[in-house]
Amino acid sequence: MDETTYLVQLLRDNWPSTSVMEDTLGIAAAHRIKPTVLDIRNLSSGASTDGSTGKVSRGQARQYSLLNKLSPAVGSATSSDLIIVYEDGQDNTYPTIDWSVRNESYSMTCHIRTVSGGDTRAADNIYGHDRLESIYKILRYTIESQRKGSTVTIGSDSLKMHQIHLGGRTESNNKAKRLFGYKVNVTMKRFAISV
């Protein structure tokens, strides 16, 4: 299992329940959702605008509609809001004199996307801002609850990270398309990997 798949599955498996969103995080009822979490490299994991899935030919892109009222049901999502996960880079260090072990650090990005205006969910942009902030708070809670490491298993394949840190965030808005977004940096670390 690669690191991007690990983070996608970690978010899907550990997204908090609506009661945690309400009681612990204070998220308004309209924003207690589970967004679609996708690996940017896996073109067949996306959903077209009608919610269907399938293989995509080389050179083609999968279209994803944030206005789709019917959730594409990728990873048990309950809304068409989107978190795209991708790896920015990796760094290795060798902390021993004999170079017998390696520490690995992975820089990841979780790109949160939601839409405001032009959809049936709201009449103004406040809804989009509130939705984006709510998804960010839930993402932050999910990552911080796993900060001391976690093992993710898919079938017979498993991977353990020893530390997961939430980093900075930057806005990524597209006013012309009325898209709101945050790019959130996540660092995942593995220690003492035998060489």
Region annotations inferred by a language model:
Residues 130-193:
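Acidic-leaning, charged glycine-interspersed low-complexity segments
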Residues 1-99, 146-155:
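Small/polar-rich, solvent-exposed N-terminal microdomains that initiate assembly or binding
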Residues 7-11, 83-85, 108-112, 139, ...:
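Hydrophobic beta-strand residues in large extracellular and virion-surface proteins
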Residues 99-105, 113-147:
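Extracellular/virion structural assembly segments
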Residues 81, 87, 104, 157, ...:
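Polar/charged side chains located within well-ordered beta-strands of beta-rich proteins
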Residues 100-119, 177-191:
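Oligomerization/assembly interface segments of phage tail-like spikes and tubes
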Residues 1, 194-195:
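Short, solvent-exposed mixed-charge patches
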